[in-house]
Amino acid sequence: MARTEPVQPHAAAVFTPSVILSFDVEEHHRIEAAAGLSVPASMQTEYASRMETVTRRLLDRLACTGTLATFYIVGEIARSHPRLVADIAEAGHEIGGHSWDHRRVHRFDARGFAEDLRITKDALEQDAGCQVFGFRAPTFSITRETGWALDVLAESGYVYDSSIYPVRHDRYGIPDAPRSPFVAVGPGGGSMLELPPVTYRMMRQNLPVGGGGYFRLFPLWVTQRSIQQMIATTAPPVAMLYFHPWEFDAGQPRLPLKRISRFRTYVGVKKCYDKLESLLNTQIFRRAIDVVAELHDLNGPLPRFSLGEGVHVVSARITSSGASARPVSPARSP
């Protein structure tokens, strides 16, 4: 299988318009809509098996199209499916953290969140044989109420984050956050390079069209047009898409969810794989870490966005309090 090679520094500060493909990998019953449900052990076992099956199917399809992606994986999968994590990394994809068991940031205090970040990062790095640079909070749960998480992240060894969605939503979102890459600053002054998901700007509002249920609900052209708008109108021109392996499992047993949650969770699942197939055949994708490496070579500043008081001056170059070195693409240990 292909091995990921380090990215070399760019001589020119010219940024390549980029579309990032990412997957948030958790088992079917770990989704936020199922929080608090009592899921039988037999169903959990089936979901674990189906998660691996559909993830490997996605890996095969990505290999056929020569596409590299970023996989944000919950730590418990590193424990239960270590070979899967290793195979994702061995195929050249980036491994990122996605918490230990898909708990939202709101359910932690700072100490608990720091420990969750640590054990997840350690477990993934052990299986993948390479460093983990990126993090995405479950359900994009870094919001104004949990801005303190940026201070914790900045001291955790991660280089970038993809947890802030610049939209209005009942579960997440900071609607006035920048739509393109920016430096997010926590109330304690910790800063992280932030890669937000795709939005579509219309009537002074950001519409959430970057993946998940929105991708399943809307026609494919909505996603395609949103990518075009992001590349044409934002700077740096970056469009981040996100999906979940369970969304490509049309035959999965349904969880006993309430009506609205059931609709949000399962709408469009049967057509999701075909829509992704169309994107893979028409769009060139990159890993998040490769975009981050290129952003680090830019000479100009990125927008700064504060989630609290006590903000220190953020360098014009992209740095974070906890990981200021320029990242290279993760390479597996020999």
Where are the regions that the model predicts?
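Surface-exposed cleft-lining segments at the edges of enzyme active sites
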Residues: L207-L217
